[in-house]
Each structure stands twice: as structure tokens, then as C-alpha cells.
């Protein structure tokens, strides 16, 4: 039979747990967006904060903890089902045994977004900015040869997201990775074209713009 003292201690524990849950900072506050924020607003807010607090760029002692907090908030709010559950139950939706994830190590296991690879691919922090990063970047956009043509993309002369450095990085990445190559039907404005002749080939250097991306390639045809 429970004693009055044990009941009192149990009640205190419940009260403390409740206060901790209520005191937890809202995921919306962490990202600095309103509860009515759109998916795009959440994505842009996360991008901005992730750039600011990524441990490779921010050397302050609490940067890593802040970055993980931001990542956890984004993981929840960027998923429609998790966001709906969070809006209904708050943090308790993920701290209880029945939640989709617990705290600490559970979060580490469920959050699989590789930020290091993302930022290194763009050479944002000045590391692997030359050969290694360039090869990985170009591999993302390696295109298949057109049937019967000797056209090859030799290098990317310029890459720009527009609207400020990496302003809409995540949105642009989604667009870029949604196609496997620059087919002729998708080519738009030809910016420049330089022709030159070899002993057996007629070649031209073509610079094209597709949306916010500019690519340069050499088109050679035998004579």
C-alpha cells in the first residue's frame, strides 16, 4: 500500500516532468518560424541556421549542440506526419516510449541526413574545394552520350544558384537531382559559341544556361 510520502514524491516527479516538457523550446522557435510556416519557409530557415551553426564553420563550444537542436527541429517539421503529431502532442509525442523516436541516441539513429557530404560537395567551408570536391560535384551531373553523337561535357565553367550565395540551396538541389542529363529537349538559351577546326574534326565550344545553371561543353563531329 502506498504511503502518503511515496504518493507525494510521485506527484512531485510527475510535476517536474510536466514542467520540463512545457519548458522545452518549440521546434518552431528553434527555427525562428511561425507555426503556420510553409514547407519552403521551414526549409529556408533550416538552411540559414545550419550554415551558421555547422561545427565545421562555427567553432564556438555550443555550436554542435545548437546544430543538432536545429537538425532535430527540421527533421520533425519537414515531415508532414511528424509535424502533425508534434502540433497535436508537442514534445511528448517523441519523448514517450510509444513515440516515433526518443531522446538522445534514438534521434541519432533516426536522423540520416549527411550534412558533411552536403556541404563538402559544395566546398562551402574551404575544404576539398579543388579536385576531390569538383569530381564529386561533376559526378552528380554526369550525362549520358546522345545516340550517335560524340558530344561530351568536359567541365562546368560556372555554377550559380542566383538570389545570393546558396539562398535556395535545398530547393535548387531538388530540381537539379530530378533529371539525369541535359537532353536536347531541355536545353534553353545558348550564351556563346566558339568554333575551331582540327585536322579531322570540326569542333565548337558551347555555353548554355538552364535555369540558374550554366554549363560549357565541346561538341565535335568528324568530317
From Swiss-Prot:
Signal sequence, renumbered to the chain? 1-23
* Modified residues annotated as Phosphoserine in this record: 133
Q: What cellular component GO annotations does this protein have?
A: cytoplasm; endoplasmic reticulum; endoplasmic reticulum lumen; endoplasmic reticulum membrane; extracellular exosome; nucleolus
Gene Ontology process terms (BP): B cell differentiation; ERAD pathway; negative regulation of IRE1-mediated unfolded protein response; positive regulation of immunoglobulin production; response to endoplasmic reticulum stress; response to unfolded protein
Its main subcellular localisation, reduced to a broad class, is: endoplasmic reticulum
Q: What residue stretches are annotated with the J domain?
A: 26-90
SUPFAM superfamilies documented for this protein? Chaperone J-domain
Tissues expressed in: Widely expressed. Expressed at highest level in the liver, placenta and kidney.
What are the subcellular locations of this protein? Endoplasmic reticulum lumen
The protein's GO terms of the molecular function aspect are: Hsp70 protein binding; misfolded protein binding; protein-folding chaperone binding
Swiss-Prot/TrEMBL keywords: Chaperone, Endoplasmic reticulum, Phosphoprotein, Signal, Unfolded protein response
**Pfam families given in the database record:** DnaJ
Q: Which residue ranges does the record annotate as region Divergent targeting domain?
A: 91-223
How would you summarize the oligomeric state and partners of this protein?
A: Interacts with HSPA5/BiP; interaction is direct. Interacts with ERN1/IRE1 (via the luminal region). Interacts with DERL1.
Anything noted about its domains? The J domain stimulates the ATPase activity of HSPA5/BiP, while the divergent targeting domain is required for efficient substrate recognition by HSPA5/BiP. The divergent targeting domain specifically recognizes and binds to aggregation-prone sequences.
The record's function comment reads: Co-chaperone for Hsp70 protein HSPA5/BiP that acts as a key repressor of the ERN1/IRE1-mediated unfolded protein response (UPR). J domain-containing co-chaperones stimulate the ATPase activity of Hsp70 proteins and are required for efficient substrate recognition by Hsp70 proteins. In the unstressed endoplasmic reticulum, interacts with the luminal region of ERN1/IRE1 and selectively recruits HSPA5/BiP: HSPA5/BiP disrupts the dimerization of the active ERN1/IRE1 luminal region, thereby inactivating ERN1/IRE1.
Q: What is this protein called?
A: DnaJ homolog subfamily B member 9
Amino acid at each position: 500500500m502506498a504511503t502518503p510520502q511515496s504518493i507525494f514524491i510521485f506527484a512531485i516527479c510527475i510535476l517536474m516532468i510536466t514542467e520540463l516538457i512545457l519548458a522545452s523550446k518549440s521546434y518552431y522557435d528553434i527555427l525562428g518560424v511561425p507555426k503556420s510556416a510553409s514547407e519552403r519557409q521551414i526549409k529556408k530557415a533550416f538552411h540559414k541556421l545550419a550554415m551558421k551553426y555547422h561545427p565545421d564553420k562555427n567553432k564556438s563550444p555550443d555550436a554542435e549542440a545548437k546544430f543538432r537542436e536545429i537538425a532535430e527541429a527540421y527533421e520533425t517539421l519537414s515531415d508532414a506526419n511528424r509535424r502533425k503529431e508534434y502540433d497535436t502532442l508537442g514534445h511528448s509525442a517523441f519523448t514517450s516510449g510509444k513515440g516515433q523516436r526518443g531522446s538522445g541516441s534514438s534521434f541519432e539513429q533516426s536522423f540520416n541526413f549527411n550534412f558533411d557530404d552536403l556541404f563538402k560537395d559544395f566546398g562551402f567551408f574551404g575544404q576539398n574545394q579543388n579536385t576531390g570536391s569538383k569530381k564529386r560535384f561533376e559526378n552528380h551531373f554526369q550525362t549520358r552520350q546522345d545516340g550517335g553523337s560524340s558530344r561530351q561535357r568536359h567541365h562546368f565553367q560556372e555554377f550559380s544558384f542566383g538570389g545570393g550565395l546558396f539562398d535556395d540551396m535545398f530547393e535548387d538541389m531538388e530540381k537539379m537531382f530530378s533529371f539525369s542529363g541535359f537532353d536536347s529537349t531541355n536545353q534553353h538559351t545558348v550564351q556563346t559559341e566558339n568554333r575551331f577546326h582540327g585536322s579531322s574534326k570540326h569542333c565548337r565550344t558551347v555555353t548554355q544556361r538552364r535555369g540558374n545553371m550554366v554549363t560549357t561543353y565541346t561538341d565535335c563531329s568528324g568530317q
